[in-house]
């Protein structure tokens, strides 16, 4: 009898993606984050769906509706805590997934990498509009500060900002459209993730050594299905520990106060996963310059494949590049810390130095290290 999973039009796609897919035999736990991101996306869509049943996107009732979800809806507090902290887990997995791609040279699969960068931007947009929805103080002022950056665009800036707001300031129209965006974007993310997977399966996975693994492949199931299941169990455990024991530890206390346009919080800052970009934005005294640096901090990922100078794909056997990679990691942690600090010395100068180092590492030092490693590997006799 012919196996149904190999002949049925729909089952065949699933089979070729998750069952009979030939996978390198040596991929480490750093390759788990793709499936974990998929799990995060499903968790966020499901919890978000149940939250949307009870949420009202009106400035007068949004804050109260979130309180109602937590107080009166069956397990509403749990659904909301999983959704809020699920976003943090999502970004944690995203950053590790991108870091893995940079370390092991996965960015040389250019189409997969570029779709990945577009996915990152889309997830960031989704998280931003989602943070505005509870209509607390930090929701309102975060939306005001970030959307105001559009006004830095020459000539059309003010018109563009007012068009996004749907008025002359962040108000009811803004909240309503942000809810609409927050509802539709996860489905766009799902579609992009499938395209991401499509391009990945054109080439097959990279592996820690960076060498072509075609000579040694194993089936995805059962080896990597069980490995992914373990990863998902640990992810779920961490998410539940966070959501049940300290659900508000990553949030801002200001967001427990309803939005008030007449009272500005002393320190306006986004969620932790945006702080590195926020620090780069603030490190430039000029408004337009800051916006351009903010965009560049993410879009620089698109040119990483063009800056690959080394003869070896992976950093596994390149100690100088490894050192620079971990300096970049430490630098991003420093930027995240600075983004959460007030705008005063010594934080200003630390932020400016860290911002310069961020671009210097990616655009100059890492390509130079690749060239130097090539030179060192050449026989000298």
From Swiss-Prot:
Record: residues binding heme b b562: 83, 182
Keywords linked to the UniProt accession: Electron transport, Heme, Iron, Membrane, Metal-binding, Mitochondrion, Mitochondrion inner membrane, Respiratory chain, Transmembrane, Transmembrane helix, Transport, Ubiquinone
Pfam families named among the record's database cross-references: Cytochrom_B_C, Cytochrome_B
Entry note: cofactor: Binds 2 heme b groups non-covalently.
Domain of life: Eukaryota
Membrane topology classification: Multi-pass membrane protein
TM ranges: 33-53, 77-98, 113-133, 178-198, 226-246, 288-308, 320-340, 347-367
GO cellular component: mitochondrial inner membrane; respiratory chain complex III
Binding site for a ubiquinone: 201
Names of the cofactor(s): heme b
Location within or outside the cell: Mitochondrion inner membrane
GO BP annotation list: mitochondrial electron transport, ubiquinol to cytochrome c
Matches recorded under PROSITE patterns: CYTB_CTER (PS51003), CYTB_NTER (PS51002)
Binding site for heme b b566: 97, 196
Record-linked Gene3D superfamilies: Cytochrome Bc1 Complex, Chain C
Molecular function in Gene Ontology: metal ion binding; ubiquinol-cytochrome-c reductase activity
Disulfide feature: none
Misc. comment: Heme 1 (or BL or b562) is low-potential and absorbs at about 562 nm, and heme 2 (or BH or b566) is high-potential and absorbs at about 566 nm.
Membership in a protein family: Belongs to the cytochrome b family.
Description of how the protein assembles with itself and partners: The cytochrome bc1 complex contains 11 subunits: 3 respiratory subunits (MT-CYB, CYC1 and UQCRFS1), 2 core proteins (UQCRC1 and UQCRC2) and 6 low-molecular weight proteins (UQCRH/QCR6, UQCRB/QCR7, UQCRQ/QCR8, UQCR10/QCR9, UQCR11/QCR10 and a cleavage product of UQCRFS1). This cytochrome bc1 complex then forms a dimer.
Function per UniProt: Component of the ubiquinol-cytochrome c reductase complex (complex III or cytochrome b-c1 complex) that is part of the mitochondrial respiratory chain. The b-c1 complex mediates electron transfer from ubiquinol to cytochrome c. Contributes to the generation of a proton gradient across the mitochondrial membrane that is then used for ATP synthesis.
Protein's name according to its UniProt entry: Cytochrome b
Annotated gene: MT-CYB
